[in-house]
C-alpha cells in the first residue's frame, strides 16, 4: 500500500523508485516495523502513537468469514509516506537501490520530524489518495473469497 500512496501522491518520485527497483518499498521495512521510533525524538514517539490510536489505526479489520485481519494502519502508512515525500530531493538524488537503503537507514533518523508535522502531512496525503484504502480492502476481500473456491 505504501507504494500505491507514493504513486498517487508523487508520480515522479514513484517513477524514480521504480528506476531504483525499489517500488515495493522494502527500504521502508524498518520504519514500519519499529513504528517510526528511530525516526522521531523520544518525546515525539508517544505523541505519534497516541495520534495513531486516536485515528483508529489499531482497530481490527475483519475478513469476509468474520475472522480478524489485523489493524488498518492507513494513517500510519501515510505517515511513513509523508516522511519519504519530505525527503524527496534526497531520494531523487539516489542513483541505485543501495543509496536509498543507506539514506533511509542513516539520514531518515537524523531528520528532525515532529509527530504533528508528519500526521498533518499524512492527513493531506490521505485526502490525495482518498478511496485507496477502500479499494485495497475490496481487493483483499475478493482475494479471500477466491481462496475459498
Predicted regions: what they are:
Residues 1-149:
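Helix-rich, well-folded core regions that mediate interactions or catalysis
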Amino acid at each position: 500500500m505504501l507504494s500505491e500512496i507514493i504513486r498517487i501522491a508523487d508520480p515522479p518520485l514513484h517513477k524514480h523508485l521504480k528506476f531504483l527497483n525499489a517500488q515495493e518499498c522494502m527500504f521502508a521495512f524498518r520504519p514500519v516495523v519499529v513504528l517510526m521510533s528511530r525516526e522521531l525524538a523520544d518525546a515525539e514517539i508517544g505523541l505519534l502513537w497516541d495520534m495513531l490510536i486516536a485515528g483508529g489505526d489499531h482497530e481490527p479489520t475483519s475478513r469476509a468469514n468474520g475472522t480478524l485481519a489485523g489493524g488498518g494502519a492507513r494513517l500510519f502508512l501515510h505517515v511513513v509516506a509523508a516522511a519519504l515525500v519530505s525527503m524527496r530531493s534526497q531520494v531523487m538524488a539516489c542513483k541505485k537501490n543501495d543509496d536509498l537503503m543507506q539514506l533511509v537507514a542513516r539520514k531518515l533518523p537524523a531528520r528532525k520530524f515532529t509527530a504533528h508535522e508528519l500526521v498533518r502531512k499524512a492527513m493531506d496525503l490521505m485526502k490525495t489518495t482518498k478511496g485507496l484504502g477502500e479499494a485495497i480492502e475490496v481487493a483483499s476481500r475478493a482475494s479471500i473469497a477466491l481462496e475459498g473456491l
